[in-house]
């Protein structure tokens, strides 16, 4: 059975500046590099290696994938890219619209501003992953993506998380892949929070 390790990139310059970072990009910070090393240490400690490594086409994800895996042969996939925040790209996060009461995502709030609907993001990421999975018989895959993209995927999969849980930098979702390429979340691992583990 294939195991998919889907993780968020390390901290970036825009993260520290609290700027919206979707389709725009910024480099990993020194802390972001350290976070990637924490994730790498987790995989090494658990004896986990990867048959193939994938990342979004954005630099912050590809650089994280290379650092975590220790490999240069990272396959870039556009479908793993971060959500498009439209006119809010690179702007202060404080300018973003607020979630509707009771909501746990932007839903379609950014569409009028040229952004994406989080549900469409989730479908895009899900379809991209399934396309890879249906064409492989490999046992262990690493994919590096982005916070909102991963959240959208989990919404598409109808996964619920405990209150207050979010994808911090280099958060790792461990999925078991069934024969029909469907995904079952087994664990969420947070290397930057003393390797805290949530089981599902």
What is the role of each PLM region?
Residues 2, 76, 83-94, 137-139, ...:
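Acidic, low-complexity terminal tails and accessory targeting/binding regions
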Residues 4-62, 113-126:
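Loop-to-helix element that buttresses phosphate recognition and phosphoryl-transfer chemistry
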Residues 38-100:
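Phosphate-coordination/substrate-recognition cap region in phosphate-metabolizing enzymes
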Residues 67, 152-156:
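Active-site signature of alpha/beta-hydrolase-fold catalytic machinery across serine-
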Residues 100-120:
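Short glycine/proline- and acidic residue-enriched helix-loop micro-motifs
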Residues 147-151, 171:
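GST superfamily/GST-like fold recognition
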């Amino acid at each position: 059975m294939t195991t998919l390790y889907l993780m968020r990139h390390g901290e970036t310059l825009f993260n520290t500046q609290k700027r919206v970072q979707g389709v725009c990009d910024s480099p990993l910070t020194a802390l972001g590099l350290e976070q990637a090393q924490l994730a790498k240490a987790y995989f090494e400690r658990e004896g986990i290696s990867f048959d193939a490594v994938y990342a979004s086409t954005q630099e912050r994800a590809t650089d994280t994938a290379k650092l975590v895996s220790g490999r240069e042969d990272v396959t870039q996939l556009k479908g793993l890219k971060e959500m498009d925040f439209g006119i809010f790209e690179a702007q202060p996060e404080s300018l973003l619209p607020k979630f509707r009461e009771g909501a746990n995502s932007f839903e379609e709030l950014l569409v009028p501003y040229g952004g994406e609907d989080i549900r469409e993001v989730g479908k895009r990421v899900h379809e991209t992953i399934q396309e890879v999975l249906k064409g492989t018989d490999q046992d262990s895959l690493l994919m590096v993506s982005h916070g909102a993209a991963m959240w959208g995927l989990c919404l598409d999969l109808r996964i619920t998380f405990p209150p207050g849980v979010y994808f911090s930098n280099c958060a790792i979702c461990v999925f078991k892949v069934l024969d029909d390429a469907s995904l079952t979340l087994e664990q969420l691992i947070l290397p930057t929070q003393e390797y805290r583990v949530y089981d599902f």
